[in-house]
Amino acid sequence: MNAKENALRIIRFDHPERVVAGPPIHNLCYLGCHHEGFAGGGHDCPVGTRWTDIWGTDWHKELDGVMGFPRGHPLAEVSALAGYRWPDPDDERLLAKLHRLAAEFSPGDRFLAGQHRDTLWEKSYMLVGMENLMQYFHTEPAFVREVLGRIMDFQLGIARHYLRLGVEFVSLGDDLGTQQGPLLSPDIVAEFLLPQYRRLFRLYKEHEVFVGFHCCGNLDAVLDMFLDLGVDVLNPIQVTANNLDKVRERTQGRMALSGAVSTVTLMAGPPERILAEVRERLWQLGRTGGYFCGPDQGLPFPKEHTDALWAAVEEFGRYPLRPPDGR
């Protein structure tokens, strides 16, 4: 079977040939998906760059190898909402990049995939500011609902462009956890975020599109929500924030997991320790499918360590998997 067929079997827990790093995809994205502005910027720019993205959020690239940091928030004040100009998902300046990337796609062993980076929660605090938004959930709930609804209106507009181009897989993402627990209370998530998420999931599920979701941190409070929404692949499954056995138990046969190799291990090494952890994760999470093996964060790891990671997945990721240490 080719790489795409194998990935489908992983997602469906249906006897794949091997564990791989992730679904093979040809990514589509619009101008602004990675925080670009009409005048440039984005995460590939040099350290020290300052720019304004398509939403009016001001950014500063402070560290090499990671995304910039939002430093100015156009909706920090509730009064700013009345005069705020929302980005238009039909703006040809945004879509030119999307159509160029779509024209480069050749059907075969990859999914045509779309991206909705900072789908809802993260986009809202970039617009409003984290501290402000945390207060406004309680003091200005109508304002928060308006902001979240308009963000999702934009995402739905982009989704319709993706669907017209024939996407089979989409990547969504909002970091909802800390190392110890949820970033937001379950009541806040249920009242403010979940209704908006349902709008986007409903559209994609109606078109039988696979949905991947990126959520850093502890997953205990949101895992049932992701299962209910219909997330097909969840990443990055942070080792230091989760009980991996419990996460696998709750998702077995229902949702594939991606990631789960510790950033701490990958940064510190040595290669022998990385190999041992990969073998442990393969057996722990992937015995019956449903697992893509990779880092639990995207950081600039030493090349020797990433080489050791992928070599271990290649060597030990073929089914039937072998238990580590002769178990």
Locations of the language-model features?
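Helix-coil boundary/capping segments in enzymes
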Residues: 28-101, 107-109
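Active-site loop segments of alpha/beta catalytic cores
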Residues: 1-26, 52, 61, 85-327
